[in-house]
Every structure is written in C-alpha cells, then in structure tokens.
Amino acid sequence: MTIAKMIDHTALKPDTTKEQILTLTKEAREYGFASVCVNPTWVKLSAEQLAGAESVVCTVIGFPLGANTPEVKAFEVKDAIQNGAKEVDMVINIGALKDKDNELVERDIRAVVDAAKGKALVKVIIETCLLTDEEKVRACEIAVKAGTDFVKTSTGFSTGGATAEDIALMRKTVGQNIGVKASGGVRTKEDVEKMIEAGATRIGASAGVAIVSGEKPAKPDNY
C-alpha cells in the first residue's frame, strides 16, 4: 500500500472556505488519498466532488471536545452519512474516562458505532495528550469492546498530537485486527514512517501533499 492510500487528507480549521475544500478534494483525486477529513458542514460538497473517486469522505463527530451526549453524537453520524460520509472520527467523553465512568464512555462510543453500522467506518479519538498511559489503554480497550474499527490519537486541537510511543501502546492494546490512526503534528514523510513503524495503519494530516511529494509544508498545522 502506498503512503497516499494511508492518509486522511485533512481540513478541519473553523475558517476553512469552500475554495479550500475544492482544492482538498481535487488533491485527494490527484494523489489517491484514503479520504478527505472535513467538518460536517463540508461533507455534502466533498461527497459531490469525490463522486466516482477512490477517496471517500470522512467527517468528525463530537469534535473537538467530545463533550456532547451520546444521542447528539448518534444524530451527527446519521446526518453525516445522509450527506455522503463513509468514515466518521468521533471524540470520546474524556471527562467520563477520567472519572472512570467506563459505562458512559462505552455507551457514548456504541451510540456512534450503532448509528454508523454497515454504512460508515468508525474511528475513536482518545486525545492521548490529555491521558495517562493507564487511561490510554483503558480508552482503547473500551473502544474495541464497543465495536470501533479504529482508535485514533488526537484531534489536533488540544495540547499535543501523535507520538510513536502512543501509537505503539495503542497497537499493543488493540491487537492486529483494529486500525490505529496517528494524527496531530504529522507533517513529513519521516514522521509518517515513524508512525507506521510504531503500528499506525492510517495517518491524519493537513500536509498530505507535502508528505507524498517530499516538499516542505507551506504552513504547518496542528493536524
């Protein structure tokens, strides 16, 4: 598999414009990225632009704080699928995890998994920069139990992004049958190679073109 096919080509900034989305989808077609990852408001346009392409549309749920209710997250998923999303990246209830309310964390993830069943792949963002190693392991275990397809490191909107150490810990926890996505601060081909070596099977990056072309990113983003 080429590096491009492992990348979710990402534009999640709040000030993203239509022109930037059109560029993003054009680049996805050109380079063959796995997906474009966009905010829910851009799902429909992105799906229209990628009709017939190998790249699919990924969107974010409960993003970036994860502090919505399970019911709201489930509605977001259904709306996104209706608009053409084929993958959804949800943020867990981080406070509940820290409170050791494993039941709520699982119910929250399961609401998204159930809403997406048979229609969209689910990635669970655990926001590693806010967690202890014990919490990272517990978050991954709960996500697997709830039926996720992937676990993912970061939103790119908190205090830190992906590290090879976290990817290795997540891979060790979930085993070989669940995907692991590295996102947040992955900007170069070298960064990507480190993450893949540690166990990542998907990369979230706004610097996708720079990564596959070997050029320096014009303007580094957090994700």
From Swiss-Prot:
Source organism superkingdom: Bacteria
One GO MF term: deoxyribose-phosphate aldolase activity
GO cellular component: cytoplasm
GO biological process: 2-deoxyribose 1-phosphate catabolic process; carbohydrate catabolic process; deoxyribonucleotide catabolic process
InterPro entries assigned: Aldolase_TIM, DeoC, DeoC/FbaB/LacD_aldolase, DeoC_typeI
Record's subcellular location: Cytoplasm
Active site: 89 (proton donor/acceptor), 152 (schiff-base intermediate with acetaldehyde), 181 (proton donor/acceptor)
Pathway(s) annotated for this protein in UniProt: Carbohydrate degradation; 2-deoxy-D-ribose 1-phosphate degradation; D-glyceraldehyde 3-phosphate and acetaldehyde from 2-deoxy-alpha-D-ribose 1-phosphate: step 2/2
Catalytic reaction annotation: 2-deoxy-D-ribose 5-phosphate = D-glyceraldehyde 3-phosphate + acetaldehyde
EC number, UniProt record: 4.1.2.4
Keywords carried by this UniProt record: Cytoplasm, Lyase, Schiff base
Presence of the UniProt keyword Signal in the record: no
Protein family according to the UniProt entry: Belongs to the DeoC/FbaB aldolase family. DeoC type 1 subfamily.
Task performed by this protein: Catalyzes a reversible aldol reaction between acetaldehyde and D-glyceraldehyde 3-phosphate to generate 2-deoxy-D-ribose 5-phosphate.
Name of the protein described by the UniProt record: Deoxyribose-phosphate aldolase
Species for this entry: Listeria welshimeri serovar 6b (strain ATCC 35897 / DSM 20650 / CCUG 15529 / CIP 8149 / NCTC 11857 / SLCC 5334 / V8)
High-level lineage: Bacteria, Bacillati, Bacillota, Bacilli, Bacillales
Gene expressing this chain: deoC
